[in-house]
């Protein structure tokens, strides 16, 4: 097996392809990406057999920005008989099992790309999952009792009703979510749907233990470009006191909590109160990404905050290059100032033409 499938948001196939090609080359693995615009996925084909499995183990999935999921896959199974799609899939897994220990598998996902065209196909996938799972269990798969994410997940990736890729992912280096998507319900108390972006970011970048430790009633936050309060809502919900910086009005429900101080100022000019220790800076301002990157770097280097989650709105062209420029600007400034830092970026499900970045720093 020499192929990876990477799911992504439609329209971001080129960025996903550029990123996986670069990350693979850093590991000394070379190949080429098959890209169909607006397909919602990319196939990366390695020149050498076995290297796709190596990439799936060695490229840290949490360091991939645009990929929602990373799967080692077979060649495309075509012309599956409508009366028995299961047998060819089982046969393919038995073949793969001679290369990888699939008796360490714990879960099955029967998936499609996240496109409007695939919605009808996803209905079939749901119905197909139960009989396929039963057939796989009869073969001894999906019964592994996992310890510390040591198992594998089986993936069937349908591109047409009679065509699919058969594959697997490593549980310690993948998205645990179906189709790589973390779906969240909109809280009716939140002032705007943008609240889902910060909610997903917190769940993506912080473990439950880290969230409890780093976001609580003893913490202070700043939300730049806060109006009407979608991101402020997520901080207040976790007990933080928030300086909400925006010339616009904040939702009355947030004022009623007594946990915000509305500062009607320019987010680029605002500085935190001198006697306040700011733990978190969040920012979802619509602005050139390089300006936002410079602003975040200034806050971190000046030690105005210790941790930040922010969005970078991406241009229509050369988006991956722009992301690299922005992250490089921030890391260069932190390196010059002698900070240790952890940085992670992700194109979240609730993001649109943007990515979300998390940075924590310490001297």
Curated annotation (Swiss-Prot):
Q: Write down the chemical reaction(s) this protein catalyses.
A: cytidine(2498) in 23S rRNA + S-adenosyl-L-methionine = 2'-O-methylcytidine(2498) in 23S rRNA + S-adenosyl-L-homocysteine + H(+)
Instruction: Give the Pfam families listed for this entry.
Output: FtsJ (PF01728), RlmM_FDX (PF18125), RLMM_N (PF21239)
- Which residues act catalytically here? 313
Instruction: List residues binding S-adenosyl-L-methionine.
Output: 194, 227-230, 246, 266, 284
The molecular function terms of the Gene Ontology recorded here are:
S-adenosylmethionine-dependent methyltransferase activity
**What is the annotated localization of this protein?**
Cytoplasm
Q: Which GO terms describe its cellular component?
A: cytoplasm
InterPro entries from the xrefs? Answer: RlmM_FDX (IPR040739), RlmM_THUMP-like (IPR048646), RNA_MeTrfase_FtsJ_dom (IPR002877), rRNA_MeTrfase_M (IPR011224), SAM-dependent_MTases_sf (IPR029063)
Which BP terms in the Gene Ontology apply to this protein?
methylation; rRNA processing
* UniProt family annotation: Belongs to the class I-like SAM-binding methyltransferase superfamily. RNA methyltransferase RlmE family. RlmM subfamily.
Q: What does this protein do?
A: Catalyzes the 2'-O-methylation at nucleotide C2498 in 23S rRNA.
Q: What is this protein called?
A: Ribosomal RNA large subunit methyltransferase M
Q: Which organism is it from?
A: Mannheimia succiniciproducens (strain KCTC 0769BP / MBEL55E)
Lineage summary = Bacteria, Pseudomonadati, Pseudomonadota, Gammaproteobacteria, Pasteurellales
Chain's gene name: rlmM
